[in-house]
Amino acid sequence: MSLKVDCPTCGTPVEWSPLSQFRPFCSDRCRLIDLGEWFSEERSIAGEEHTPSSDTARPQLSAEDLALLEQD
């Protein structure tokens, strides 16, 4: 007996095996719908939102690093 999981997008049962090309999704369409939801931020992983402070936004380069950059 093989393991079956529900497609995260539409709920269709999907056999979990190497033969299931789009697992855990039932189709490429469902896979792309899910990907689009992540890109549009409809889906996300819970946690604190990260906003870089002005100190960490741009690293300060040392005089040595600047000299190396000017050589190129």
Curated annotation (Swiss-Prot):
Positions of the UniProt region annotated as Disordered: 44-72
Record text on cofactor binding: Binds 1 zinc ion.
Taxonomy, superkingdom: Bacteria
Keywords noted in UniProt: Metal-binding, Zinc
SUPFAM superfamilies named among the record's database cross-references: Glucocorticoid receptor-like (DNA-binding domain)
Pfam families, per database record: YacG
Binding residues for Zn(2+): 7, 10, 26, 30
Entry cofactors: Zn(2+)
Entry's Gene Ontology BP terms: regulation of DNA-templated transcription
InterPro entries, A to Z: DNA_gyrase_inhibitor_YacG, Znf_NHR/GATA
GO molecular function, one term: zinc ion binding
Gene3D superfamilies (alphabetical): Erythroid Transcription Factor GATA-1, subunit A
PANTHER family assigned: DNA GYRASE INHIBITOR YACG
Family in the record: Belongs to the DNA gyrase inhibitor YacG family.
UniProt function note: Inhibits all the catalytic activities of DNA gyrase by preventing its interaction with DNA. Acts by binding directly to the C-terminal domain of GyrB, which probably disrupts DNA binding by the gyrase.
Record text on subunit structure and interactions: Interacts with GyrB.
UniProt xrefs under HAMAP family: DNA_gyrase_inhibitor_YacG
Stated name of the protein: DNA gyrase inhibitor YacG
Organism: Tolumonas auensis (strain DSM 9187 / NBRC 110442 / TA 4)
Organismal lineage: Bacteria, Pseudomonadati, Pseudomonadota, Gammaproteobacteria, Aeromonadales
Gene: yacG
